[in-house]
Regions:
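Upstream accessory/linker segments immediately N-terminal to the RecA-like ATPase cores of bacterial MutS
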Residues: 1-57
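Conserved motor-coupling elements within RecA-like helicase/translocase cores
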Residues: 147-149, 155-179, 187-195, 340-357
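Conserved helicase ATPase motor motifs in RecA-like P-loop NTPase domains
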Residues: 90, 118, 203-205, 216-239
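Conserved pre-motif I regulatory segment
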Residues: 42-88
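Conserved interdomain linker/interface between the two RecA-like ATPase lobes of SF2 helicase motors
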Residues: 243-312
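C-terminal helicase module of SF1/SF2 nucleic-acid helicases/translocases
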Residues: 268-289, 309, 313-481
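Conserved SF1/SF2 helicase motif Ia
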Residues: 84, 98-127, 137-150
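SF2 helicase catalytic motif II
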Residues: 170, 184-226
Length: 481
């Protein structure tokens, strides 16, 4: 192709870019079309059911957003067409309650709901918090249990064989109304009596293939609710999750506290680092708890950056803190190499207040909920992406006390990495940060095959720049199909 003028070249490029946008939107529209042609069991709201009892006993008011999204879900599930909805919301915006209400609505109609979590730590936490939130509504089959209740079960890769056998039987005979688990739910031998709803937590950890694998466990196509706390700019949502309807929770529940974030340069301001450890001592003396996060487990781990040999590891930080500035505190250590039982035990101790400060890797990034934690120090913060830092900091300020997040770094003041950290310190708006993140990264990373089920590298199309083109392509794709 040899264009005769700059204008002709520009027009040709525009045309090729549009072709790429259209091909992608056709793929998503086809998925959507296939989904819409399916039929499923409508799940109608039942008066006097578990959901109504649950709502009447809630110790707090639902936010306007939670009620609105709840209505959208209720309307979806009444239909004979399976719900296919993405629920995105800021860290701590109360997505789990919305999902739990949907699960109860399905149990009320005689169906079962499955909650798929990305890690065992998160699955175990969901199991504990949902069981506690439901109270006697989760006591079906137990001695002295309520006759107006369901059974909540947990299934992960490390569920011991005898317990696993019992849980599988309860899933198969339908006595387990709410099934919480990890990838283990996708394995052979897990058979549901009537799987009516799948809730996938933290979407970016699961590919399309895994969503589809769980759907095959149902006799009729189940309703699907996908939750993510990583806010997604609208065009990315249209591009990556174009086959899903989108609901957004923007307001935080009452009682949530603000989070302040500061960047600390370790080399230029070493006394500020000492002050960070003092701040943890002060918070603990007031009865609060703290996190210290590092990017790697051992100092010996290489990450391809030879100039950063001194990078912090959780093991070296744990030794330094327990022998130095935090030696008077009860300090715990949590990372991915521990067994599931150890991870669960440590998280439980921290949640119960038996550990003052938890030194951890990003195991704690998603969903960990300890309202008493008020301060987080992130070592080598430049090693984390914007959305990861936003997720991590969302672990503090979850209760009535304000949260503080301190980002430690040694990078150059003028570097792109420092720009990222300053952006996180400036804003607590996840949607704004998601756009900054997208500006800084190649879009191929955002549209990974693991996320979209489509090819991972866009050649010409740029998600933010070509926003209006993507919208046009979406309209055309819908018309073509």
């Amino acid at each position: 192709h040899l264009p005769e003028s700059h204008l002709a070249a520009t027009k040709s490029l525009e045309r090729l870019t549009f072709d790429e946008a259209l091909a992608l939107q056709l793929l998503l529209a086809r998925r959507r079309h296939q989904f819409e042609s399916l039929h499923t069991t409508p799940r109608l709201f039942r008066s006097g059911g578990l959901l109504e009892i649950f709502d009447n006993n809630l110790p707090f008011e639902l936010t306007a957003g939670q009620i609105e999204v709840g209505n959208e879900i209720e309307s979806d599930m009444k239909s004979q067409r399976p719900m296919h909805r993405l629920l995105q919301g800021e860290v701590g915006s109360g997505k789990t309650i919305v999902a739990l209400r949907a699960l109860l609505a399905v149990v009320d109609t005689g169906g079962q709901g499955a909650l798929l979590a990305p890690t065992e730590v998160l699955a175990a936490q969901h199991f504990r918090s949902i069981s506690a939130t439901l109270g006697e509504l989760a006591t079906a089959g137990m001695l002295g249990g309520s006759d107006r209740a369901t059974r909540v079960v947990l299934l992960t890769g490390s569920t011991p064989a005898p317990a696993r056998k019992e849980v599988l039987a309860q899933i198969k005979d339908g006595s387990a109304g709410i099934v919480i688990g990890t990838h283990a739910l996708l394995s052979e031998g897990v058979d549901f009596a009537d799987l009516g709803l799948i809730v996938v937590d933290e979407q970016h950890r699961f590919g399309v293939e895994q969503r589809d694998a769980l759907k095959l466990k149902a006799q009729l196509p189940p309703h699907l609710l996908v939750m993510t706390a990583t806010p997604i700019p609208r065009t990315v949502a249209m591009t990556v999750f174009g086959d899903l309807d989108i609901s957004t929770l923007t307001e935080l529940p009452k009682g949530r506290s603000p989070i302040t974030t500061h960047v600390i340069h370790e080399v230029e301001k070493p006394h500020y680092v000492e002050r960070a450890w003092e701040r943890i001592l002060e918070e603990v003396s007031k009865g609060a708890q703290a996190y210290v996060v590092a990017p790697r487990i051992e100092s010996s781990e290489k990450d391809g950056d030879e100039s950063r040999e001194h990078a912090h590891s959780v093991e070296s930080l744990y030794q330094f803190l327990t022998q130095g500035p935090l030696r008077s505190l009860r300090v715990g250590l949590l990372h991915g190499k521990l067994t599931s039982e150890e991870k669960d035990r440590i998280m439980r101790s921290f949640a119960q207040g038996d550990i003052d400060c938890l030194v951890a890797t990003t195991v704690i990034e998603v969903g960990v909920d300890v309202p008493n934690a008020t301060v987080m120090v992130i070592a080598d913060a430049d090693r984390f992406g914007i959305s990861q830092l936003h997720q991590l900091r969302g672990r503090v300020g979850r209760g009535a006390k304000p949260g503080l997040c301190l980002l430690l770094t040694t990078v150059d003041e003028q570097s792109a990495a420092m720009e990222r950290l300053q952006a996180v310190a400036r804003s607590v708006d996840g949607f704004e940060l998601a756009r900054v993140d997208l500006d800084q990264r190649r879009e191929g990373d955002v549209l990974g095959a693991s996320q979209s089920g489509s090819r991972s590298h866009l050649r010409l199309l740029r998600v933010l720049r070509d926003e209006s083109m993507i919208e046009d392509a979406r309209i055309d794709a819908t018309t073509i199909l």
